[in-house]
């Protein structure tokens, strides 16, 4: 499933050993969408390049880019480089409150570093302990997929996608349990 791959990749791409020895930054989509006139100059400065007007346009090699037609936002503002549909999407569209709790806990260090959450180490440690047994169970979004595809839950739990996601979730949990963070986590771009 595409969603499983995206979760797995995100959990690992925010914490790569390449960030430890190379100069790398992360840029919040919200900063780019809501404050392009501050964010793009900050990116240019960090990269050591000149700010150009074309950076504010949806172009690729000088040609107009019409957006990704596979995006759920394509018909709304998919052709607007600074459209806000993607950052204003209703929470809960895919993940239940239970799913969100687990993912929010696993992404906690990233969320704190990038300013999405306030630091609360004691609550984080409590939540981390609480989610460990939950990682061995199906997420609600997985139950929905199984129901829609008419796959028996026991069979679903033997599937490659289920086992792949679990291996990543448990590895990330183990790292957080040991370090209380991701040791090689990406740092955010500082915008003045």
Give the location of each predicted region.
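PAPS-dependent sulfotransferases, especially Golgi type II membrane carbohydrate sulfotransferases
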Residues: 49-192
């Amino acid at each position: 499933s595409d969603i499983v791959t995206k979760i797995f990749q995100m959990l690992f791409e925010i914490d790569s050993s390449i960030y430890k020895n190379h100069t790398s930054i992360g840029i919040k989509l919200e900063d780019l969408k809501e404050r392009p006139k501050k964010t793009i100059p900050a990116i240019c400065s960090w990269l050591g390049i000149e700010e150009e007007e074309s950076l504010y346009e949806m172009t690729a090699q000088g040609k107009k880019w019409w957006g990704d037609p596979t995006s759920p936002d394509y018909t709304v503002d998919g052709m607007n480089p600074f459209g806000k549909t993607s950052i204003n999407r209703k929470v809960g569209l895919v993940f239940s409150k239970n799913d969100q709790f687990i993912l929010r806990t696993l992404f906690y260090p990233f969320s704190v570093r990038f300013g999405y959450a306030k630091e609360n180490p004691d609550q984080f440690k409590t939540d981390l302990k609480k989610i460990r047994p939950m990682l061995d169970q199906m997420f609600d979004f997985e139950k929905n997929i199984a129901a829609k595809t008419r796959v028996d839950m026991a069979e679903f739990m033997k599937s490659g996608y289920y086992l792949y996601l679990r291996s990543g979730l448990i590895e990330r949990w183990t790292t957080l349990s040991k370090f209380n963070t991701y040791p090689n986590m990406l740092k955010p771009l500082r915008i003045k």
